[in-house]
Amino acid sequence: DQFKMLRVNADSLRFILDAVLAWKAKLIYASSAGVYGNSPSPMREGEGEVPENPYGFSKLMMDRIALNFMEENPHIKVVGLRYFNVYGPGESYKGKTASMVYQLYKQMKEGKRPRLFKWGEQRRDFVYIKDVIRANLLAMEKDVSGIFNIATGVARSFNEIVSILNQLLGTNLEPDYFDCPYDFYQNYTQADITKARELLGYEPQYSLEEGIRDYLKHL
């Protein structure tokens, strides 16, 4: 239900901000790279915010509500973190919406060829959950407000994930490519994380190789 999604995300944030104002509390909330749609990369806060699906639009609505609140209440700190493609322990409950790292791992662990949209060169800015946690802790510590991209600043392909998994699992499985069935699909996402670096002191610690290697310890 698209309208329910818009209401839940936008209205819930309004209610939370009312409580934040009453309690003079600091708020850190989850935004999303979905606000950028298929805008050119590297994606920067305040530029190319043209979502192409209801989820991305609902997150952009949240960001605009938050920015208005920040302007009206500069003494209260509010931070929105725009997560890019997060992967890591604790996502299995998400099923088909879990990360591509998890989906491909499951297929390959079972000895199946990993299925990818043709030709696997779609690129994403994959960020490991431990870097996301660090970003939240930094946002708690810093006396700043704003919207920040949380990613690695590097775009990697789905084919590269398969290659890394083959190496770590000791397999040699070739991708099974098929046509993308979606009218809208983000073919390339890459964040500019300059703002998070400068104002939060955020610096990603895990490359895709390092993140997947650590992730496999938990699977």
What are these regions, as identified by a protein language model?
Residues 38-39, 50-79, 84, 108-110:
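Active-site Tyr-X1-5-Lys
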Residues 14-54, 79:
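Conserved Rossmann-fold NAD(P)-dependent oxidoreductase catalytic core, especially the SDR/UDP-sugar
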Residues 108-219:
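C-terminal substrate-binding subdomain of Rossmann-fold SDR/epimerase-dehydratase oxidoreductases
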Residues 5-6:
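A hydrophobic alpha-helix adjacent to the NAD(P)-binding/active-site core of NAD(P)-dependent oxidoreductases
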